[in-house]
């Protein structure tokens, strides 16, 4: 590959930008703490996982063996036997959500999909693309679905086969819809378990709840029919990706035999990235369950540290149990822009993913939020200046490298 000097300079400039901002992210669920150096050599190959990783295909350069290991890992993590499940490495959380909703629609073609107003924006696209009837359900103040409103809407619709989109960690507030409560309420109104579908969007929390002592219900043992998790959020990846797992009996309904690839196609996309399954495989193989627990505990401790600091300054900050999403009142647009914070209405959040291995970035943000909240007292007490500077840059510790 030959580039002009101007094009090369443009790449070099972007390289410096990436180096400077590698660990900037505190407002979005993305973990920059990874090192896939041992996989760099495979970038010279066009690796394509078209089709089903469980069957031999006609395209030789695939990473099916690695993808199978990844799916075996997540089947166990989400409490379903591998032989009773099927899933794949997706392009991200939206594809995983679409896959789950697609299975639900094929199982209940006339069913209505119910989702809370705190649900990820991808659901609005999905229901349009799949042409599923849908109903938005009110949210409780803490971000969970309003269970009374859910049941009222199901009753008003006289829906016999509801499709419930369950949030296992909402985007803005990290709320987890109570799967046990939903099932209990449906049972109370006489809807049998086999007559409805539960899809769980666990984009961030899917790699948190399996590694805490007292997780909220979220997996197949707790009653879900499908679940998806992102690969670039808690695990970390240079390429956005995700994992979706579903019950095999439901997946078989959408399987199509494609003669020219000599494989059954069960996925949303045709050609699929063959590099991301290898990255997920490397990340999972290089961290023991104890190491994942330590990573999760570190992130949870950092989140609680942020809550404590903000509350000590009189700022109404909070988080859910087992959540690394810290919710607080929306600061000025200057602070939100500087720290790339996600805001919605009068609410903002910070997210303590594993690349925050010390508290420098968290402290820098909180210092400014406190200064804005109580400027005179805070500045007098700490004598701070230069708050308009760039947040401190950091280097990730090597003991968290994936490879």
UniProtKB/Swiss-Prot annotation:
Disulfide bonds: none
Signal peptide location: none
UniProt enzyme class: lyase
Keyword terms: Decarboxylase, Lyase, Pyridoxal phosphate
Name of one Pfam family that matches: Pyridoxal_deC
Keyword Lyase among UniProt keywords: yes
An example molecular function term from Gene Ontology annotations: pyridoxal phosphate binding
Catalytic activity, reaction form: L-histidine + H(+) = histamine + CO2
PROSITE patterns with a match to the protein in the record: DDC_GAD_HDC_YDC
EC number per UniProt: 4.1.1.22
Cofactor(s) named in the record: pyridoxal 5'-phosphate
GO biological process: carboxylic acid metabolic process
Keyword Lyase part of the UniProt annotation: yes
Positions carrying N6-(pyridoxal phosphate)lysine: 233
InterPro entries: Group_II_Decarboxylase, Hist_deCOase_bac, PyrdxlP-dep_de-COase, PyrdxlP-dep_Trfase, PyrdxlP-dep_Trfase_major, Pyridoxal-P_BS
Residue positions binding substrate: 120
Subunit field text: Homotetramer.
Similarity annotation: Belongs to the group II decarboxylase family.
Name used for this protein in its record: Histidine decarboxylase
Source species of the chain: Pseudomonas entomophila (strain L48)
Gene label: hdc
């Amino acid at each position: 590959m030959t580039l002009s000097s101007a094009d090369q300079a443009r790449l070099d400039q972007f390289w410096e930008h990436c180096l400077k901002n590698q660990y900037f992210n505190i407002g979005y669920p993305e973990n920059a703490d990874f090192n896939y150096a041992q996989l760099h050599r495979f970038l010279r190959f066009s690796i394509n996982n078209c089709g089903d990783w469980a069957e031999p295909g006609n395209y030789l350069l695939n990473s099916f063996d690695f993808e199978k290991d990844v799916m075996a890992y997540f089947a166990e993590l989400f409490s379903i036997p591998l032989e009773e499940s099927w899933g794949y490495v997706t392009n991200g959380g939206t594809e995983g959500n679409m896959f789950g909703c697609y299975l639900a629609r094929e199982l209940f073609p006339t069913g209505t999909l119910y989702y809370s107003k705190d649900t990820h924006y991808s659901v609005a696209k999905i229901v349009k693309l799949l042409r599923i009837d849908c109903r938005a359900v009110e949210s409780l103040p803490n971000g969970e679905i309003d269970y009374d409103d859910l049941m009222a809407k199901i009753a008003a619709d006289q829906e016999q086969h509801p499709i419930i989109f369950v949030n296992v960690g909402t985007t803005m507030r990290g709320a987890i819809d109570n799967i046990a409560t939903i099932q209990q309420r449906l049972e109370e109104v006489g809807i049998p378990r086999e007559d409805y579908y539960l899809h769980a969007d666990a984009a961030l929390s899917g790699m948190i709840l399996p590694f805490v002592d007292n997780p909220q219900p979220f997996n197949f043992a707790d009653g879900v029919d499908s679940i998806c998790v992102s690969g670039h959020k808690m695990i970390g990846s240079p390429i956005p990706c995700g994992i979706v797992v579903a019950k095999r009996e439901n997946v078989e309904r959408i399987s199509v035999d494609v003669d020219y690839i000599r494989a059954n196609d069960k996925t949303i996309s045709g050609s699929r990235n063959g590099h991301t399954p290898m990255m997920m495989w490397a990340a999972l193989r290089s961290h023991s369950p104890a190491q994942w627990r330590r990573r999760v505990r570190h992130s949870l401790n950092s989140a609680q540290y942020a809550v404590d600091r903000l509350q000590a300054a009189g700022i109404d900050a909070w988080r859910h149990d087992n959540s690394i999403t810290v919710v607080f009142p929306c600061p000025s647009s200057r602070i939100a822009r500087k720290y790339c914070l996600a805001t919605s209405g009068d609410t903002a959040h910070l997210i303590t993913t594993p690349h925050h291995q010390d508290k420098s970035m968290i402290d820098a943000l909180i210092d400014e939020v406190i200064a804005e909240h109580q400027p005179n007292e805070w500045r007098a007490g700490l004598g701070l200046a230069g708050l308009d500077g760039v947040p401190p840059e950091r280097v990730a510790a090597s003991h968290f490298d994936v490879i």
